[in-house]
Amino acid sequence: MNESGRVEAFSDGVFAIAITLLILDIKVPKADGPGGLWHALGAQWPSYAAYVVSFLVIGIMWVNHHQVFSYVARVDRALMFLNLLVLMVVAAVPWPTAMLAEYLREDRASHVAAAVYSLVMVAMALAFQALWWHLTRTGHLFDPRVDAPAARATRIRFALGSLGYPLTVGLAFVSAPLTLAAHGLLALYYGFNQVPVPTREAAAPS
């Protein structure tokens, strides 16, 4: 296994653990009778909503992480530390997810929980952006397929896409459910608009 393969394998393990931990916060409700169980299941909708959104966030982050590292031929010390920074935030996602699910239906507490959740998402976006900027700074870590100057030119586009995350911190003090929905939409945006890794084959005229 090459250097980048070891980093990616370790990262896959962290992503897998973080995404699995999300379901552990959805508890089996206690209720008397079938009707009571349906009511108890419905009352847990904040946990379901928070689980789905955070699953999308981590899952799509993993897809983009895999997309980027499939073009990385070698790693340096800075890249390893930046990748650890990304993983540190990913591993933290179950915590604000559980907090937001717990307080989503409350008034003032829901705003604080949504703001904390949004701040974690901001940290994740900044960490991944720092990793991408380091990779594209010189391009020497990419394999020969990558058009390094073209990859470097995507940094502004990538940064513009991250501007939505700080806005959700302000939205958190307006509506916690809307904040959660906004993070779901941002995750879907990055799901359909993956991190661009321009290759020489794609740039070559047909």
UniProtKB/Swiss-Prot annotation:
Site residues, Hydrophobic filter residue 3: 24
Cell compartment(s), UniProt: Membrane
InterPro entries to which the protein is assigned, alphabetical: TMEM175-like (IPR010617)
Region Short helix H1, residue ranges: 31-34
Keywords from the UniProt entry: Ion channel, Ion transport, Membrane, Potassium, Potassium channel, Potassium transport, Transmembrane, Transmembrane helix, Transport
Short helix H2: region residues: 36-42
Its job: Potassium channel.
Record's protein name: Potassium channel B446_29190
Phylogenetic classification of the source organism: Bacteria, Bacillati, Actinomycetota, Actinomycetes, Kitasatosporales
